[in-house]
């Protein structure tokens, strides 16, 4: 039963209704390696989970031509918009995976592939009965440990305080991750501001930044 469900999810994940040279194809039998992501091998690789309209990764890709950016996004309208922006800027260091990363993550990529992973404003699922749907949990931290090398970085942002506090506790319990300086930041300069983040700031919402370094595999 579990195997049948997994096969069905892989089938859904592979069912993209349009094609693009900027797509990567996930496979249940072969993990993606840095040698087959782009036409060349980059110095470092950056993964954005839930890339939305692509503005964050595209801004960073323009500034960091020696880094390969992989975007995981499941919504077709956002993917189409991102592709148009990639083409507009003639970027050769951005690729997209149309895969729900809550279904498949470490199953898709080889170990230690990414030096940085970004997760911006995932659904906080505020109601207690929905907490099990939250992306960041102990299993997710294990996935980060697989995909990041030692000293690899994870960037996270949310505007929901209880979720931020829960994640801080998860990282404390893990022991594998360490804050760079402080456990919680109110500003972050390493990552461009997304449309969603700007909107929340304009609404007067507090943004919680939780950035961690992998110190123990």
Curated annotation (Swiss-Prot):
Gene3D superfamilies: Vaccinia Virus protein VP39. GO terms for molecular function: tRNA (guanine(46)-N7)-methyltransferase activity. The active site is at 123. S-adenosyl-L-methionine binds at residues 48, 73, 100, 123. It comes from Leptospira interrogans serogroup Icterohaemorrhagiae serovar copenhageni (strain Fiocruz L1-130). GO terms for cellular component: tRNA methyltransferase complex. Substrate binds at residues 127, 159. SUPFAM superfamilies: S-adenosyl-L-methionine-dependent methyltransferases. This is tRNA (guanine-N(7)-)-methyltransferase. Belongs to the class I-like SAM-binding methyltransferase superfamily. TrmB family. It catalyses: guanosine(46) in tRNA + S-adenosyl-L-methionine = N(7)-methylguanosine(46) in tRNA + S-adenosyl-L-homocysteine. Signal peptide: none annotated.
